[in-house]
Amino acid sequence: MWSGRFSSPVCAPVQSFTASVGFDRAMCHCDAAVLAAHCRSLYLRRVMSIADLADVERGLSEVAMGARAGAISWRPELEDVHRNVEHVLTELVGKAGRMAHTGKSRNDQVSTTARVWLRHMAGAAICRVEELERALAARSRACLNTMMPGLTHMQVAQPVTAAHYLTAYRCMLSRDRSRLVRCTRGACVLTLGSGALAGTNHGGDRYTTADMLGLHCVSPNSLDAVSDRDFVMEYALCCAVLMVHMSRLAEDMIAWSSSIVGFAVLGDALCTGSSIMPQKKNPDILELVRAKAAVLIGGAMGIMAVMKAQGLAYNRDNQEDKAVLLGASRAVTRSLSVMALAVRSLRLNKSRLRRRLESSFAIATDLADSLVWHGMTFRDSHEAVARAVGVAIRAGHAGLRALPLCSRGVVPPLLAARLARIAQPDARVSAFRKDSTGSTSPKWSFRAMRRA
């Protein structure tokens, strides 16, 4: 491609080091679509004949089909998917293939192909997010009245319904889906026609080309267009945040399904065993989701670090964005699929959850509120219940039933009597009493499930 400028060919180590076709060939079908749209633009500008355009379109169709079938021999010495596609096209259709590079640079082609590819992959990720949301919704409906301990600081705090807990993750995923939609919309900008950095002498109607590729608008500045990787950074961050949310869900499911906690059971088909310990049942897929979240966070930070060191315009540093894009998309779509399977297989141990609530002081806050209804200030009622809890713990008693007994001599007799009357060990009462919008009561949990 540039052999006329140099007196010797690029050496093999440099070819190997600079080649990206090993991973960016996944964008082959998108690159073929971009090249076809560009050639149609050349035809409209009367730079390419209708016969040559027909040859190019036929050749690109064969290239795309060959790539899907694994029939293309990718050549690392051609560096990337873009030159490989053009090379195979030229082998198929001859001179018309060599005309395809007229009026464009790899700089604007690379950016446009990545944007088209991102639109497809973000759409696939959105579908997988919706699949996980449906799985969470199904499990939420099945446990609308199932009570479980809600935690703060990893300590039992207050009772919540399992439906409320799972719906919280649906809320996170809903935000993730909205972010992906916004990110996709921002990426749908045509940069083709910007050339290497200054534009092109063979520019056609860029708006028509954008329509051909399903892009919303055209870039207003060629310098910015070829060097802009905001869409990569935004997509990487969207994927990283999504993976953080899945990692949090995975962490909860790992804890629930551990033999020490025993709040839930995962399906056998989703777990693995040990090579030495016969009794083990390991939630490997959930642990891998946690790890992939860390990798994607690193990728998002990495591409921002790559970009912060560059002035205008294009630099070869930007080649590294493909690994981030491809890695993030692959990790997100696969993780979403296995998380949906894990959620569908999840079975809560209702009796274990109930016993854990009964052996805790989870509704102590409700008792303090009840004393407020009897005329105490909340600060005073909080102190009274806290004293009773402290006495119960020091006496070795567990659970709410011990509070009335342990309150004697700790709080005034009248308050102790009130505490005995209102003590209610059924955690469901605590949940049903919550009347604030978005609370854990089944009424609001049901409404949240319908909205999420």
From Swiss-Prot:
EC number: 4.3.2.1
Keyword Cytoplasm: yes
Main localization (coarse): cytoplasm
Pfam families, alphabetized: ASL_C2 (PF14698), Lyase_1 (PF00206)
GO biological process, one term: arginine biosynthetic process via ornithine
Cellular component terms (Gene Ontology): cytosol
Protein name (Swiss-Prot/TrEMBL): Argininosuccinate lyase
Gene: argH
One example GO MF annotation: argininosuccinate lyase activity
Database matches in HAMAP family: Arg_succ_lyase
Domain of life the protein comes from: Bacteria
Organism of origin: Tremblaya princeps
Signal peptide from the UniProt entry: none
Catalytic activity as recorded in UniProt: 2-(N(omega)-L-arginino)succinate = fumarate + L-arginine
PANTHER family associated with the record: ARGININOSUCCINATE LYASE
